Amino acid sequence: RNKEKNKNEFTCEKPQHILAEIFYAFANALSGQRNYKLSNFYINLSKYLNPNFLSYNALLAENLVMLKKYDQARKIYEKLFDAGSFYKWHSSKEVALILEVQDKKKESIKFLSKAYKNIDVNLYRTFDLANFLRGHEKYEESIKLYSEILSKINEDHTLYPKVLDRRGTAYERIGN
């Protein structure tokens, strides 16, 4: 299990860390404008100024996916596995989507299912996996996960109606 905290180093006492954050803000804005190459330039400046702030890599990988540089993006996402449980799950989902784009559907499902077994599981991550499996026509597996979630939450939980609806849809798809 991946129980360590997310690993990012930042201190306001270091001017280079502050400058790195400013460049990252530029990179984020440029990415939002679909200027991925220039965004990557600013991300790389940020990484140079603060190489111990691993979160910069998430935007870099997202930009590379948008530029259809899937293998480079995957390598970055795999490095993010070590940045903490949040990034491990986020990166695993993104790698699964990359595999899907590369017409590796079975490998995608297997990859995300395996990653799920090696993270700190919570309701939302279970819901993510159940949705992913349902979207890939793995209805029985998704029903098990939806049922597991329902057994752990009350009817007034925000996830309850969504889980109930999606489980019902999965049942409909298999004819039950």
Predicted features and spans:
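TPR-adjacent "capping" and linker segments in tetratricopeptide-repeat scaffold/adaptor proteins
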Residues: 7-22, 154-158
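Short coil turns that delineate tetratricopeptide repeat
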Residues: 51, 85-86, 120, 154, ...
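TPR alpha-solenoid repeat register
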Residues: 56, 90-91, 125, 159, ...
